[in-house]
């Protein structure tokens, strides 16, 4: 989870 709504990566967001 980095930042913001990362729609290209469900697990990261």
From Swiss-Prot:
Tissues expressed in: Expressed by the venom gland.
Highest rank taxon of the organism: Eukaryota
Species name: Ophiophagus hannah (King cobra)
Main location: secreted
Record function comment: Binds to the platelet and collagen receptor glycoprotein VI (GP6) and activates platelet aggregation.
Protein name per UniProt: Snaclec ophioluxin subunit beta
Subunit annotation: Heterodimer of subunits alpha and beta; disulfide-linked.
Other comment: Negative results: does not agglutinate fixed platelets.
Boundaries of every C-type lectin domain copy: 11-13
Family: Belongs to the snaclec family.
């Amino acid at each position: 989870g980095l930042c913001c709504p990362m729609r290209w990566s469900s697990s990261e967001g």
